[in-house]
C-alpha cells in the first residue's frame, strides 16, 4: 500500500483497486493475463504488498476502467475461488496484524493442531510461531482476518456446546445422587435434576482498532445510550493502534445476558465501520510553522461543515476518518484553504 501512495498523482487512489483471494506465488503478468485480460491494456502498474499474501494493488490508466472493475465486485475464476475486488481507500485498513491468545482453547483443543488447521483454511495469512502462553501473531489482508475470526468463533461455539453438554450431564447426575437427597430437610420436597443457576453475566473483553473505536464513540449517537440502556460499564484501554474494552454488568446480574448482547452489538457496528470508513492522513512534520498554523485554522473552520468526519490532530500529522466522500472533500478543502497543493 505504501508503494501505491508514493505515486505522485492525485488520481492514483481513484484508479487503484485492491484484489484479494489470489493464489499465492502468482506473478504480475499471470495476474493480468489470467484474471484481467480484457482490461490488460489499461493496467498501468501491479503492486504486490510484501506483507500481505494473496493481495495485489492494480493501478489502471483510467478511472472509469477501475470503476467498472469495482462495480463487478467479484471475478469468476472458473473452478477456483472468487476474487474479491474493492476500492483502494474503501476500508480503513487493507493490511491487518493481530495478536491472538489461543490459550482459551487449551482444555479442549491441541493448540498446535488448531494452528495447522487455520493455516490450511486460510493460506493467505502469515502466522508467527506459537508461543508457550498460547499467543500467536497473525498478519494478512482484512478480509482474510475476517475469515480467521469466523473460523475461531465456530471453534469457540463448538467447544462451548461440548462444555454445556458435559455440565448438563454432570448436573443431572448430581441432582439424582441419593446422598444429596437424604441430606435435604425432611419438610422440603426433594427435587431431582435441579440445576445450579447460571452465574450473573461475567465481564466480556473486546479488542478493536483504535481509529474505528474512536469513530464509534465520538461520531455515533447510539454507543453511549446503548451502554446506559443495558446498564453496562465499559472500561477502555487505548494502546496505540489497539483499544481493549472490558464490559461489565453495572447492576450485579439484574440484567442477565446484557453484557454479551452489548458486546455483539459493538462487534457488529465495528465490522460495518471497517468496511465503510476511509482514512486520510495529512502530514505536518517537515512543514513550516506558518503552513501548520494555516492548516490548523482551516481545520477548525471545516469541522462544522463535515460533522461525519472524525478529526484527530497529532503533533506530526492529522487523521481524518469517515465516509469516503466526506473525507475526500474535507482533505481537498483543508489543503486549498491552507494554500497547499492537493495531492
UniProtKB/Swiss-Prot annotation:
<keyword id="KW-0694">RNA-binding</keyword>
<protein>
    <recommendedName>
        <fullName>RNA-binding protein 43</fullName>
    </recommendedName>
</protein>
<dbReference type="InterPro" id="IPR035979">
    <property type="entry name" value="RBD_domain_sf"/>
</dbReference>
<feature type="region of interest" description="Disordered">
    <location>
        <begin position="170"/>
        <end position="200"/>
    </location>
</feature>
<dbReference type="GO" id="GO:0003723">
    <property type="term" value="F:RNA binding"/>
</dbReference>
<feature type="compositionally biased region" description="Polar residues">
    <location>
        <begin position="184"/>
        <end position="194"/>
    </location>
</feature>
<feature type="domain" description="RRM">
    <location>
        <begin position="15"/>
        <end position="90"/>
    </location>
</feature>
<dbReference type="InterPro" id="IPR012677">
    <property type="entry name" value="Nucleotide-bd_a/b_plait_sf"/>
</dbReference>
<dbReference type="Pfam" id="PF23085">
    <property type="entry name" value="RRM_PARP14_3"/>
</dbReference>
<dbReference type="InterPro" id="IPR000504">
    <property type="entry name" value="RRM_dom"/>
</dbReference>
